[in-house]
Curated annotation (Swiss-Prot):
NCBIfam families: cyt_b559_alpha. The lineage of its organism: Bacteria, Bacillati, Cyanobacteriota, Cyanophyceae, Oscillatoriophycideae. It is a single-pass membrane protein. One of its GO terms (biological process) is photosynthetic electron transport chain. This is Cytochrome b559 subunit alpha. Heme binds at residue 23. Keywords: Electron transport, Heme, Iron, Membrane, Metal-binding, Photosynthesis, Photosystem II, Thylakoid, Transmembrane, Transmembrane helix, Transport. The keyword Transferase does not apply. Belongs to the PsbE/PsbF family. The gene is psbE. Its cofactor is heme b. With its partner (PsbF) binds heme. PSII binds additional chlorophylls, carotenoids and specific lipids.
């Protein structure tokens, strides 16, 4: 059972001038916003990941791998010292 949904066909939307005026501005702005989000370091702060120079400290040069899931909180505290 097929019917008409009343929506505009995709070919009409993509070939309209209005579509390209709007998207020629918004799509590049999304890329620029993403680039700024990462390049300024805000992504590290928002998601809580260490910056590339913070993975290893002078005191700890080994990989911070959690060995026991029941003692994970204590191990993470040790890694952060």
């Amino acid at each position: 059972m097929s019917g008409v949904t009343g929506e505009r066909p995709f070919s009409d939307i993509v070939t309209s001038i209005r579509y390209w005026v709007i998207h020629s501005i918004t799509i590049p702005m999304l890329f620029i916003a993403g680039w700024l989000f990462v390049s300024t370091g805000l992504a590290y702060d928002v998601f809580g990941t260490p910056r590339p120079d913070e993975y290893f400290t002078q005191e700890r040069q080994e990989l911070p791998i959690i060995q026991d899931r029941f003692e994970a909180k204590n191990q993470i505290t040790e890694f952060n010292k």
